[in-house]
């Protein structure tokens, strides 16, 4: 899944979160103006390769018809565990309207995040039941929070959204691997799409018994069309409409960082279909290979070399592409459900198939 950039500008080299949180003026208008100047989350080095992130949320001043918030949940990709029965929450700073949460991560961290402020009736309260029933109840509760999610208005980069439409902000630390391709998007620019090279088709699958949109895009190059690499993007509706990737691909190709290629973006239809088709569904991959790809090749030829074929996905999409490759892999590693997420913000890879 892509993340967005963040730069923090300060009058000192780094903001001092402990001093800021202890400031008697914390929560005042002048205090928030200073936070807005710095940008959030606040970033403080704590060792050669670790930093402390301080996330801040400003609670609106409640009027007679406005809710009083009991919790502000935070979801930071790769740091917090949204499967937990004790999800991470911000703390209120005394009697102020300041809520904060801190985490230590590696200095090359990059990830998206959102806040979910809730009133008492939306706080997690799991019913009695089997472990499986409680896990499902927790998942249903978490999904119900997506409509309450907010991006961070004090983050200096342009907000974006998840494939579900959830508002997101992002952290891009100084040592993170550069993602120059997305810098114009992070700055709020709109990259144009060459509609002459974009085709939208409807894939009617006999094997799956359904129909969906598929976007086909090709980038410029001098290579023989029949030798062009193929890239398949799952959750294609996200990359085609919500976070259009076509201008980014053109820029990277023109800069020589990507070869001229054919890109196939596959719609999920809806969430129920996504949940069935992407994880561990051999019929989906069989239909893709025997039904969809021949249609694509007739419109935009591409290589049949596996070494020049890429499948990209996230979440269920990642599981799907893993299943696509698992029978050919000598070893396959994943993070067990029960393993903790370390404070450094990286999942422990502890299991092997």
Swiss-Prot record:
Domain of life, source organism: Bacteria
Keywords, ordered alphabetically: Cytoplasm, Hydrolase
Keyword Hydrolase: yes
Gene Ontology terms for molecular function: enterochelin esterase activity; iron ion binding
Entry EC no(s): 3.1.1.108
Catalytic reaction list: Fe(III)-enterobactin + 3 H2O + H(+) = Fe(III)-[N-(2,3-dihydroxybenzoyl)-L-serine] + 2 N-(2,3-dihydroxybenzoyl)-L-serine; Fe(III)-enterobactin + H2O = Fe(III)-[N-(2,3-dihydroxybenzoyl)-L-serine]3 + H(+); Fe(III)-[N-(2,3-dihydroxybenzoyl)-L-serine]3 + H2O + H(+) = Fe(III)-[N-(2,3-dihydroxybenzoyl)-L-serine]2 + N-(2,3-dihydroxybenzoyl)-L-serine; Fe(III)-[N-(2,3-dihydroxybenzoyl)-L-serine]2 + H2O + H(+) = Fe(III)-[N-(2,3-dihydroxybenzoyl)-L-serine] + N-(2,3-dihydroxybenzoyl)-L-serine
Signal peptide (from-to): none
InterPro entries for this protein: AB_hydrolase_fold (IPR029058), Enterochelin_esterase_N (IPR021764), Ig-like_fold (IPR013783), Ig_E-set (IPR014756), Mycobacterial_A85_antigen (IPR050583)
Pfam family, one: Enterochelin_N
GO cellular component, one term: cytoplasm
Primary residence: cytoplasm
SUPFAM superfamilies listed in its UniProt record: alpha/beta-Hydrolases (SSF53474), E set domains (SSF81296)
Protein name according to UniProt: Iron(III) enterobactin esterase
Organism this protein belongs to: Yersinia enterocolitica
Taxon lineage: Bacteria, Pseudomonadati, Pseudomonadota, Gammaproteobacteria, Enterobacterales
